[in-house]
């Protein structure tokens, strides 16, 4: 016999009991996201989900995303309750631009040392995002990895699968001269451009919790959860002929709108049709950021753009506003042989 210390996984920095405690904490909120197609509960090796029976030729649409360095800001400010909504929003908004209804969502949560309260707060936010978008949170992975992350830092990633009728896929192929662009207002910077946000905070020596804009702290503006457009857009698709949808994420106006335009089509944006929310004016002024860079990095108050026939634009705006969105006509599509795919006047 030797007198060597008997080591455990916990001695190495992995607390299985904490992981089990987390699962117990989140079971209730996860259950609230359940859809009838989901078979079984948490804890299986894989999640089972049937396809909704209303689809004749169902096409699965998948997506994965994170929340970028907005997470760093949330960790620095110790605000973990809405970052999960951001995570879901970034995934499901990408799915709905193709006309897809989100079915189920999985998350990946990685940290050096698992803090059950923090993780539960994040996952509760994920469940809230799933409820807002009508998809089921069917599982996830919580990875406690000592030595991989500094202090209490963590990272999150999301994975979503949706379904769309094959004949109703929205891919931009129907976009034509004369179509109108309808904008959906953003709730803030959403989940893009936060490395620049943090640089502006640093250079301007601004404390986001002390500095106020329009009666709210800058921190509240910056950490406002990403708007989830799924239910409003799916409802709209049933009533009007949507030709294309663009989710304004990384790359802003210049890169995301061209992704859904056929060759030879140009989107002309009327800059006078809306006012930038105060947070974007502050970012531009405090960081001396050029107009071009603002439109390349941020959504500037526009979270999503829908392209549809001119004769249906007013109806679409009315339908979207009645469903709780702030929508307006922001531009038009013209045919062009040369020039940029997006022009902002």
From Swiss-Prot:
Enzyme Commission no: 6.3.3.1
Gene: purM
Subcellular location: Cytoplasm
Keyword Nucleotidyltransferase included in the entry's annotation: no
Catalysed reaction, written as an equation: 2-formamido-N(1)-(5-O-phospho-beta-D-ribosyl)acetamidine + ATP = 5-amino-1-(5-phospho-beta-D-ribosyl)imidazole + ADP + phosphate + H(+)
Pfam families in alphabetical order: AIRS (PF00586), AIRS_C (PF02769)
BP GO terms, sorted: 'de novo' IMP biosynthetic process; adenine biosynthetic process
GO MF term set: ATP binding; phosphoribosylamine-glycine ligase activity; phosphoribosylformylglycinamidine cyclo-ligase activity
Signal peptide: none
Cysteines engaged in disulfide bonds, as pairs: none
Cellular component per GO, a single term: cytosol
Functional pathway: Purine metabolism; IMP biosynthesis via de novo pathway; 5-amino-1-(5-phospho-D-ribosyl)imidazole from N(2)-formyl-N(1)-(5-phospho-D-ribosyl)glycinamide: step 2/2
Alphabetized SUPFAM superfamilies for the sequence: PurM C-terminal domain-like (SSF56042), PurM N-terminal domain-like (SSF55326)
Protein name according to UniProt: Phosphoribosylformylglycinamidine cyclo-ligase
